[in-house]
Amino acid sequence: MEDVCYLAGGCFWCMEAVFKDIYGINDVQPGYAGGTTVNPTYEEVCSQRTGHAETVRIRYDPEKISFDDILEIYFSVIDPTTLNRQGEDVGTNYRTAIFYINEYQKERAVNYIKNLEASGKYSKIVVSVEPYKNFYPAEDYHKNYFERHPEQGYCRVVIKPKVEKVRQKFFYKINNQ
């Protein structure tokens, strides 16, 4: 059995690296979602004229990992209070969004955000919960970016700490290497 979800959490290199080794995740594909341009390029998305956000499509086995577990990991590596920004990555293409494919995902995402807000841990959460409209896979050179370029500056400074945080906090959900 396989299910799918679409998450925008800033740079898709980060999101792919974070979810890639999680038990129950079958595939993580970086791409673009939520905009109006058909088959956009990276350059077009970065221009902020397409309406798309850098997004990952996550294919997962719901018998091994729940959508709530995926949301917990997602919220652990993003700043849900900044609009159109994650760290130094600024622009609408770096916005945070959950693109739900059904009412169950919508309900779970909305409830998760309500519970986070009620916890007092964050000020106002700006992660949008939007119906899935489209997803376009990113160019091949974006796939497995962190794995292929671990010594690149952005990978060392931005991606690696997020991956390490998830491996420490969710060690019991990491695939055996």
Swiss-Prot record:
Reactions that this protein is recorded to catalyse: L-methionyl-[protein] + [thioredoxin]-disulfide + H2O = L-methionyl-(S)-S-oxide-[protein] + [thioredoxin]-dithiol; [thioredoxin]-disulfide + L-methionine + H2O = L-methionine (S)-S-oxide + [thioredoxin]-dithiol
Enzyme Commission identifier(s): 1.8.4.11
Positions of disulphide bridges: none
InterPro entries named among the record's database cross-references: Met_Sox_Rdtase_MsrA_dom, Met_Sox_Rdtase_MsrA_sf
Stated family: Belongs to the MsrA Met sulfoxide reductase family.
Top-level taxon: Archaea
GO terms, biological process: protein modification process
Stored PANTHER family: PEPTIDE METHIONINE SULFOXIDE REDUCTASE, PEPTIDE METHIONINE SULFOXIDE REDUCTASE MSRA 2
Biological source species: Picrophilus torridus (strain ATCC 700027 / DSM 9790 / JCM 10055 / NBRC 100828 / KAW 2/3)
Keyword Zinc-finger: no
UniProt cross-references to HAMAP family, sorted A to Z: MsrA
Keyword Transmembrane helix: no
Function: Has an important function as a repair enzyme for proteins that have been inactivated by oxidation. Catalyzes the reversible oxidation-reduction of methionine sulfoxide in proteins to methionine.
Alphabetical UniProt keywords: Oxidoreductase
SUPFAM superfamilies with a match to the protein in the record: Peptide methionine sulfoxide reductase (SSF55068)
Gene3D superfamilies linked to this entry: Peptide methionine sulphoxide reductase MsrA (3.30.1060.10)
Pfam families for this protein: PMSR (PF01625)
Active-site residues annotated for this sequence: C11
One MF term in the entry's GO annotations: peptide-methionine (S)-S-oxide reductase activity
Name of this chain's protein: Peptide methionine sulfoxide reductase MsrA
